[in-house]
Structures are given as structure tokens and as C-alpha cells.
């Protein structure tokens, strides 16, 4: 049957760093990402909820970085 896929351990902190580097509040980044509930941003940043692939891609686009930097724990953000 299915196997659990490994989750990036550093994703939450990278999402937080991106928001901070862009100088955006949680409400502001939620609007730019098309997230209805800004509280989800906090949950992503605290590793309570895992963002969807579409949200991860939107973060990468907003930060103008390849998505690999978000999902590969071996890579540091190029910010």
C-alpha cells in the first residue's frame, strides 16, 4: 500500500523567513497567496498545518525562488 512521504523539516521556518524578508504581515501575505484565512499562514509557519503544493508554489513565485529551495532541507534560502 501507500508509504508516508517524508516532509521537509525546514519548510515552516523557510515560509516564515520569506514573509519576514518580504516585509509582509500574515494578512498581507495571505492576500498575495490567495489564502482565505490568514490564520493558516501562522499554522504553516508554526508547522501545525502542511501547506498544499499550490501554496508552496505560490510562496516560491512570490519570493522569486525555485521551489526546490523550499522543499529540499539541504538547500538554504537564497534571500
Where are these regions (language model features)?
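Short amphipathic helical patch at the helix-1/turn junction of helix-turn-helix
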Residues: 9, 20-21, 50
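Short C-terminal alpha-helical element
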Residues: 12-16
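Short alpha-helical DNA-recognition segment
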Residues: 23-43
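Residue-level signal for short amphipathic helical patches enriched in basic/charged
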Residues: 36, 51, 62
